Amino acid sequence: SRKPAVEGERWYASSPWTWDWDAEIAQNSSNIDSAFSTTENRSTGILRNSINRQNTYGLISKLNYDVSDELEVQVGIDWRTAGIEHAREVRDLLGGDYYVDYADDNAPDGKVVRLGDIIAYHNETTVDWFGAFLQGQYDTEKINLYGMGGISTIGYTYKDFFSVEQELVEAPSITTFQVKGGGRYNLDDRLSAFANVGYVQKPPILDNVIDYDGNVSTNPDNEKFTSLEIGGEYNSDLVAIKGSYYNTQWKDRNLTKSVTTGQGDSGDTDIIYLTGVN
């Protein structure tokens, strides 16, 4: 059995503790539960693995084109699709013959599982991403300018194999864009000034769009990053000095919280999607 490292003290979650493995194995090895089997021993404690199986396919391609000696243009695309299976499985029955898992809604009275069987949860998610960008750079002896713009779209799906419906939940695609630009001006051979600005949108992660029960957040806000940098640089044969001011802001952060109100569809729990957190 699990015991606190210091006798008489109580602990929660990740805390100092010891486990009497011999006692657990002895208990599992002589535990007949006639509700499930009259000949095999039921394990009340086991070891389990958390598994995450992922298959990802994609294509990244870009094209460089020199418009002139001073101007270079680059265009690119980024396509990726991923399927991820999330589950837990029985790793060791610790002396018993089987374990009873109650997580599958398709077996409300308990499901007999053995070594390697899925327990606790079993779901599959997909992430489909496509992006494109255009970038240009203009470079002369006195001035250097660059700019880029990009757009991307991402879509999520979720399927819970432990639910009765086993419905494929699909969230609407989310579109984001970003723009960045900057430049450097050489005042003379040693002194230069520079500035950079940027605006980037980041889509919410899957967990902030589709929750564990398959509920979908409609029109979630993209997270937004803005940045500004201005500065100067001086270089000589003896010394190099660089100074700059940098500011970045992160707005519309997304969070998902469960609260107990008694007003949710289940009668006791609501899922609240918090957007616009600054």
Where do the PLM segments sit?
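Transmembrane beta-strands of outer-membrane beta-barrel proteins
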Residues: 1, 74-78, 146-150, 196-198, ...
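Outer-membrane beta-barrel domain signature, strongest for Gram-negative TonB-dependent receptors
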Residues: 1-82, 240-242
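Surface-exposed loop/turn segments flanking beta-strands in extracellular/periplasmic regions
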Residues: 5, 9, 17, 21-39, ...
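Signature of Gram-negative outer-membrane beta-barrel scaffolds
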Residues: 46, 72-188, 203-205, 209-213
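Residues that define the transmembrane beta-barrel architecture of outer-membrane proteins
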Residues: 53-57, 126-130, 173-177, 224-228, ...
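Membrane-embedded beta-strands of outer-membrane beta-barrel proteins
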Residues: 59-61, 132-134, 179-181, 218, ...
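Outer-membrane beta-barrel channels and translocator barrels
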Residues: 68-70, 140-143, 186-190, 225, ...
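Surface-exposed extracellular loop regions of Gram-negative outer-membrane beta-barrel proteins
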Residues: 153-160, 171, 185-229, 240, ...
